Design a protein with these regions (language model features):
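Glycine-rich phosphate/dinucleotide-binding loop and adjoining beta-alpha-beta core of small-molecule
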Residues: 184
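Hydrophobic alpha-helical transmembrane segments
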Residues: 1-175, 179, 187-320
Length: 320
């Protein structure tokens, strides 16, 4: 277990330095391909709602079993060959399961387009990291969408997998990512996924329940450390962290809104339909492109604080 903890630290460092290199096939794509293949054959529109839910549950079972079982077998084999082999493989897995640098890189692409006043380019850049319709967004809308996705993915893409890996190594990290990837692909409330995606959505809500709240609190702490408005961040966290259809998504969005002294969320277009949504935060000042830079500063601060706390707690547990 100490080697798994070391692998997490090394994997985090690799993520900060390398991120997701272009041209390198990401293992999460294999999980996505598996989900797409199973959904294509198992999600039949002609099926009854009950059968669609059963098939969604079966798909989730298959995806979770394969996505975590295969890495576990590979790790057991590698550690059996030699502890160093196991450490190297688990470090690579931990690196691939974290998304700190890639989240910053993708959001900064939007920032650079906004600074050039390239609205069409910024819409395209933000469409790569959000699920909403981006062609209707103005510059403020693009900026808000980017800040929101940095906030939400601070939990989903960094803190949650980090927490699960601190608890159970890369094996548990893969289990979490398989659930989270299913949620991002099939947990939509439309005709195609309303019933089929319900179980994956529930599983994601459960898997993120504790990590999202912990991420929110850690983000409040980090907001003080990176010299943002930590006091207001905590106030908005307490007030607005349930202003979302998801029980988890607004936890870190509320902290981000408070730390930046801006208002996030609100109505958004998805698949050509306007969805009425509550706002998060106070409209103290207008959202601006520089908020993307500030959001990334808070992302990195939260990631470092979380790693230090998680590894320290796990190390003390292993010692005693």
């Amino acid at each position: 277990m100490k080697l798994s903890l070391l692998a997490l630290v090394l994997g985090f460092i690799l993520d900060l330095i390398i991120g997701d290199p272009h041209g390198l096939y990401h293992p999460i794509r294999l999980v996505g391909n598996l989900i797409g293949l199973l959904e294509k054959h198992m999600n039949k529109k002609s099926d009854s709602p009950d059968r669609q839910m059963v098939m969604g549950w079966l798909m989730a079972l298959i995806v979770i079993t394969l996505s975590s079982g295969i890495p576990l077998l590979l790790l057991l084999l590698a550690y059996h060959i030699h502890p160093v082999c196991g450490l190297v493989l688990e470090t690579i897995m931990c690196w691939q399961l974290l998304a700190t640098k890639s989240l910053k890189d993708e959001s900064m692409k939007v920032y650079r387009k906004l600074k050039k006043h390239d609205l069409q380019g910024s819409r395209h850049a933000v469409s790569m990291i959000v699920g909403r319709d981006t062609e209707v967004l103005d510059e403020t809308g693009v900026t808000k969408a980017t800040v929101e996705t940095v906030a939400e993915n601070t939990s989903d893409g960094v803190i949650a997998p980090m927490l699960y890996m601190a608890i159970g190594g890369a094996f548990l990290g893969w289990m979490y990512k398989s659930i989270n990837t299913m949620d991002s692909m099939v947990a939509y409330k439309n005709d195609r996924y309303l019933y089929f995606g319900r179980i994956p959505a529930y599983l994601d809500d459960i898997a993120n329940y504790i990590p999202a709240r912990l991420a929110g609190l850690l983000m409040v702490l980090a907001s003080f450390l990176v010299r943002l408005d930590g006091t207001h961040a905590f106030a908005i966290f307490k007030r607005d962290r349930y202003n979302h259809a998801s029980p988890n998504s607004a936890q870190t969005e509320a902290v981000m809104a408070g730390a930046l002294n801006v208002q996030l969320a609100g109505d958004a277009w998805y698949f050509g339909e306007l969805h009425k949504k509550k706002t998060i935060g106070d409209d103290i000042r207008p959202v601006e492109a520089e908020d993307i830079v500030r959001a990334n500063k808070l992302l990195y601060g939260t990631a470092v604080v979380s790693l230090v706390i998680f590894t320290l707690v796990k190390y003390l547990i292993l010692m005693f």
